[in-house]
Structures are given as structure tokens and as C-alpha cells.
Amino acid sequence: KRALGYQGSSMYYPELEKDSDDAVLGFIDTIKEEGFPIDGFHLSSGYATYNGKRCFFTWNTDRFKDPKAYFAAMNEKHAQNVPNVKPGMLLCHPRFDEFVKDDVFVRDSKHPETYGVGKWWGGDGAFWDYTKPEGRAAWKKYLTESIIAAGTDPVWHDN
């Protein structure tokens, strides 16, 4: 059913300075009031902004005060929420050292004792290595803790 229904998406709402959660919920209400069916919303990466950068597995609580309450409200409106996640982690990420300790990044081909650094949309970053069991296990752990446990199942794995 959802694969055939309308899925809203906008960078505008998640990029608001504050109360993005209320803005998205209001958008869903407006669409329904206009008689247009909506089955979900693809949540762009603004929810994960930390110090002006996209830092996944974090929540910007100025924009989304209570992720669990937000997802519960979306589910109550029968609008499945699909948050954006990305496979690159910026070097400035507040949990970057934790990720390094978990050995989750692609290795530098010239210096295999360390992770590789590449250009990412927000600056220098390292890329998650899904080919390693440690990488997959850590991805599952962080995704579950920060996104799935908040009340949604699908994610939009971008870039």
C-alpha cells in the first residue's frame, strides 16, 4: 500500500531553526484537510544537524523536541516517517571517536592502519564499511539506538 501512496518530502521543514516537528505534523494535517491522501514523509537530514553540520545518529532537539513523540504522532496520522541517513560521518561528529574505536570505517588503502578520509557534503569525513562484520554490527546498533527505537522502521539510506 505505502509503495503506491503519496510520500511527502521537503528540506524546508527539517531545516527550520526550531519546531520542525510541529511543521511536518502541520504539513501532514494540511494535506489531509485538503482531501489529498498521504501515506508518509521522507524526513531530510536537517533533523541530524549538530553545530551546523549533518551528524547522523544525533537529533537536533531545537528542531525535533522529542523524537519518540514525533514518530508516535506521525504513526497516529498514518503517515510513515522515513528519516534520511548517510554512510559518511564527518570528522567533527560528536561521536566520531566512538566510531573509530568500534572500527567501522573504510581503511585508507595507502595506510591501512587508519581509516580513509574523503570529501563529504559537509567537509572531511570517513565512510562506513558495510563489508566488515564490525561495521554492520555497529551500524545496526547506532541506527537502532537513534532512529528505530524512536519509533520508525524504514530509513532512507542516501548518498
What are these regions (language model features)?
Residues 1-159:
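Catalytic-domain carbohydrate-binding cleft regions of carbohydrate-active enzymes
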